[in-house]
């Protein structure tokens, strides 16, 4: 599987901060470097991942209510990371809206940032089987004099790259930012930034790149074209992968859905959730932060015949509109308070764009080599055929931390 995300708070995702430039700006003092103790960071990260999961489900529900049909694919972790870093520069009601909207209100600012710091350290890795890169960058106008405390904390806590940029030359600036995002996402996110507002003085980007190999790969010879039932009476042809294996499986009678977990190598798992016919809406509305714990208690090992469509989907979202409906609006307005970034009171987030791409095939990741086989007990296999709209979640097992969330409506 190849998962790539762009976030531009103008989040790949991308963020733009707009405002007036003045000649004088009193810098704040540097804070001493942040040192996170292992036990404290892990505790904060675990709490953070629970809140992030709750935010992800809330966001999916909002997007699903806006569009009953169509694919949804996003990274709650990427969006939360970008706005948490941005919250270092916010105060008063602007900060409280971010904390409330992202479900961080139960955590102190210190614990929230320490949790992200620990999480980013643990998730960033590259091995033969797993490649995961999560990063942030701040593109700042050469004339802007940001608060030094903000820059220091963004670097210490979020390892953000600080890149001086000439926003008066928008054409070259746009090219350079797009090259940066493309390079960081292994050329998967192209042309993330378009039509930068002339008033932009700072642009924040966040990206996630993930490549993972299935623990047990599908045999391409078993892949066949089959019907995928989008809705009653309407089907599309899709390449359907097949595998018989031993997997964790369960049925949730309250949400009328079947759950199947398929592991990647390296403590990453894909969870597929297939609702009963006509129950997709019920499933979406029933998602909440403790659902994983509930499903874990129901799961048991089964021999399962699994059919999964080969996927290649991409999605782009205007997060400004979506987050405003979740009560996060001041950060986009003239009277928002981002004075911990700069003393200029006219600073605001101009755009917030989230872009993600998903490729899933028999190997897991394009071009991955090798194969695996399971020794299966002699029993009649269960069936899990993903040939109708379903939900999918990609998460890291140890926290556990949700990285990607999707509704596959039309592969």
Swiss-Prot record:
Cellular localisation: Secreted
GO biological process: gluconeogenesis; glucose metabolic process; lipid biosynthetic process; negative regulation of gluconeogenesis; negative regulation of lipid biosynthetic process; phosphatidylinositol 3-kinase/protein kinase B signal transduction; positive regulation of insulin receptor signaling pathway; positive regulation of phosphatidylinositol 3-kinase/protein kinase B signal transduction
Primary site of residence: secreted
CDD domains: serpinA12_vaspin
Signal peptide (residue range): 1-20
The keyword Nucleotide-binding is annotated on this UniProt entry: no
Activation and inhibition: Inhibition of KLK7 is enhanced by heparin.
Keywords from the named record: Glycoprotein, Protease inhibitor, Secreted, Serine protease inhibitor, Signal
Tissue: Expressed in visceral adipose tissues.
Region named Reactive center loop: 364-382
Site label Cleavage, positions: 378-379
GO cellular component: extracellular space; plasma membrane
Gene Ontology MF, one: serine-type endopeptidase inhibitor activity
Posttranslational mods: Glycosylation slightly decreases affinity for heparin, but otherwise has no significant effect on KLK7 inhibitory activity or thermal stability of the protein.
Glycosylation sites: 92, 267
Keyword Secreted recorded: yes
Pfam families associated with the record: Serpin
Function, in words: Adipokine that modulates insulin action by specifically inhibiting its target protease KLK7 in white adipose tissues.
Free-text note on domains in this protein's UniProt record: The reactive center loop (RCL) extends out from the body of the protein and directs binding to the target protease. The protease cleaves the serpin at the reactive site within the RCL, establishing a covalent linkage between the carboxyl group of the serpin reactive site and the serine hydroxyl of the protease. The resulting inactive serpin-protease complex is highly stable.
Assembly with partners or alone: Forms a stable complex with KLK7.
Protein family (similarity comment): Belongs to the serpin family.
Name of the featured protein: Serpin A12
């Amino acid at each position: 599987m190849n998962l790539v995300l762009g976030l531009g708070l103008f989040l790949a995702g991308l963020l733009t901060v707009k405002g007036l430039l003045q000649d004088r700006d009193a810098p704040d003092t540097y804070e001493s470097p942040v040192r996170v103790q292992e036990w404290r960071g892990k505790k904060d990260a675990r709490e953070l991942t629970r809140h992030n999961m709750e935010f992800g489900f809330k966001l999916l529900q909002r997007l699903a209510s806006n569009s009953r049909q169509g694919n949804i694919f996003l990274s709650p972790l990427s969006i939360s990371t970008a706005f948490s870093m941005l919250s270092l520069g916010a105060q008063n009601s602007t900060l409280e809206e971010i904390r409330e909207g992202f479900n961080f209100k139960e955590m102190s600012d210190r614990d929230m940032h320490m949790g992200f710091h620990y999480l980013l350290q643990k998730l960033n890795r590259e091995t033969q089987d797993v490649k995961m890169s999560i990063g942030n960058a701040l593109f700042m106008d050469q004339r802007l004099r940001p608060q030094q405390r903000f820059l220091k904390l963004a670097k210490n806590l979020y390892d953000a790259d600080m890149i001086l940029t000439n926003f008066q030359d928008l054409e070259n600036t746009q090219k350079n930012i797009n090259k940066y995002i493309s390079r960081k996402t292994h050329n998967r996110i192209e042309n993330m930034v378009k039509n930068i507002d002339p008033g932009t003085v700072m642009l924040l980007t966040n990206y996630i790149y993930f490549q993972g190999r299935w623990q047990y790969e599908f045999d391409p010879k078993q892949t066949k074209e089959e019907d995928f039932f989008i809705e009653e009476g309407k089907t599309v042809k899709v390449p359907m992968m097949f595998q018989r294996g031993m997997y964790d499986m369960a049925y949730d009678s309250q949400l009328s859905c079947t759950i199947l977990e398929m592991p990647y190598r390296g403590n990453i798992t894909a969870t597929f959730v297939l609702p009963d016919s006509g129950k997709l809406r019920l499933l979406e509305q029933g998602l909440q932060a403790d659902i994983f714990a509930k499903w874990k208690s129901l799961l048991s090992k089964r021999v399962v015949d699994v059919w999964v469509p080969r996927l290649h989907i991409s999605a782009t979202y205007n997060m400004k509109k979506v987050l405003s409906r979740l009560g996060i609006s001041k950060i986009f307005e003239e009277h928002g308070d981002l004075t911990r970034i700069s003393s200029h009171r006219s600073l605001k987030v101009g755009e917030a764009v989230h872009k993600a791409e998903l490729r899933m095939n028999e190997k897991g990741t394009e071009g991955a080599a090798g194969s695996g086989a399971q020794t299966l007990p002699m029993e009649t296999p269960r069936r899990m055929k993903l040939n109708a709209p379903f939900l999918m979640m990609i998460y890291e097992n140890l926290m556990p931390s949700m990285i990607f969330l999707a509704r596959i409506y039309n592969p």
